């Protein structure tokens, strides 16, 4: 195999990877994760791109202390972020499959 063929193959692989990453990012923007805290008193919906779409607070909770509400919102958002990270890593790993990238590196692109 000569150098020109290797360069062409590398360019094709790069274009494929860029296309796969773009597609994965588009899918992540459409993917939603749902998290909750306090046994469902606070619910958060977030995209795979970490955009909070909705926060639901059970009306019963509004009668409690503001500190408790704030803590539950933070817990639900943090749970949603963890879920979004997992979904993101899976989609990016899939987008980069065949590229020989080690696990964890795919999410950097």
Curated annotation (Swiss-Prot):
Domain of life, per lineage: Bacteria
Keywords: Cytoplasm, DNA-binding
SUPFAM superfamilies from the UniProt entry: YbaB-like
Subcellular localization(s) per the UniProt record: Cytoplasm, Nucleoid
GO cellular component, one term: cytosol
Assembly behavior: Homodimer.
Protein name per the record: Nucleoid-associated protein A1S_1684
Organism: Acinetobacter baumannii (strain ATCC 17978 / DSM 105126 / CIP 53.77 / LMG 1025 / NCDC KC755 / 5377)
């Amino acid at each position: 195999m000569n150098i020109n063929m290797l360069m062409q193959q590398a360019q094709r692989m790069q274009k494929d990877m860029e296309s796969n990453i773009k597609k994965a990012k588009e899918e992540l923007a459409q993917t939603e994760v749902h998290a909750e805290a306090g046994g469902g008193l606070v619910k958060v919906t977030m995209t795979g791109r970490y955009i909070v779409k909705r926060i639901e607070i059970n009306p019963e909770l509004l009668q409690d202390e503001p500190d408790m509400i704030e803590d539950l919102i933070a817990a639900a958002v943090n749970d949603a972020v963890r879920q979004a990270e997992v979904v993101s890593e899976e989609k990016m790993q899939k987008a980069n499959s065949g590229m020989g990238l080690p696990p964890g590196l795919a999410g950097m692109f």
